[in-house]
Structures are given as structure tokens and as C-alpha cells.
């Protein structure tokens, strides 16, 4: 019975997973957040999943920094917003038409406190 419960949990977890990056090797590369986000967005669009690349920029006191996320609605037909980067996918509670709010929420979920943040969707 114990084995059955464990197998059931593993199968159930596999059914509720979020999409994976088609170019997983990019996740290991340093400073590859933008090409990773673009590849993930294109992979989602093949399956008619709404997705955009969000570019966030900030000043850390010494120099300009930035990071890219893929923002997507998953599963299709649901209004559930997710953000993806090399840390993984996180469910976000923000409006898709407000890139700054999406970036702030994504940073908070990753325990990043960033002042003077700007954000926009990649065109």
C-alpha cells in the first residue's frame, strides 16, 4: 500500500507540472537569461500559450543591471500568470498589462529586493 501511495504522488506531481524550457542547457549558462527567455517564449507559442519576454532593469549604485523573465498564462484558457527564469517557474499575482508589477512580483518571489526597478516587454 505504501508503494502505491508513493507512485500515485509521483504520477500526480507529473500531471500538474509547468512547461519546461526546450533549450535546458541554456539554464546553466551565466548571463543567458535573455536568450533563455526568448527560447522558452517561442517554445510556449508553438502550443498557443500566451507568453512574452519581460526585461527588468535597475541601478545597483555602481552600475546598471538587468534580468529577463518569460511571462506566460498557463494552462491555456486559464488566467493564471507564471514567470520563468533559471530559478524555475513561479505563479504570480499581477496584471499582464503592467510589466513593472509583474517584475516586482517575480523579484519578491525570488527574495530579491531591488530599488529603482524599470520593466518592459521585449518587442
Feature-to-residue mapping (PLM):
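A structural boundary/capping signal
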Residues: 15-123
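Sec-dependent N-terminal signal peptides
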Residues: 4-13
Amino acid at each position: 500500500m505504501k508503494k502505491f501511495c508513493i507512485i500515485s504522488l509521483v504520477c500526480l506531481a507529473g500531471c500538474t507540472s509547468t512547461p519546461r524550457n526546450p533549450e535546458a542547457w541554456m539554464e546553466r549558462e551565466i548571463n543567458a537569461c535573455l536568450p533563455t527567455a526568448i527560447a522558452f517564449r517561442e517554445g510556449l507559442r508553438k502550443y498557443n500559450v500566451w507568453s512574452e519576454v519581460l526585461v527588468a532593469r535597475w541601478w545597483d549604485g555602481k552600475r546598471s543591471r538587468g534580468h529577463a523573465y518569460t511571462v506566460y498564462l498557463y494552462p491555456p484558457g486559464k488566467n493564471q500568470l507564471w514567470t520563468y527564469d533559471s530559478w524555475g517557474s513561479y505563479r504570480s499575482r499581477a496584471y499582464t498589462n503592467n510589466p513593472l508589477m509583474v517584475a516586482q512580483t517575480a523579484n519578491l518571489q525570488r527574495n530579491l529586493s531591488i530599488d529603482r526597478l524599470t520593466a518592459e516587454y521585449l518587442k
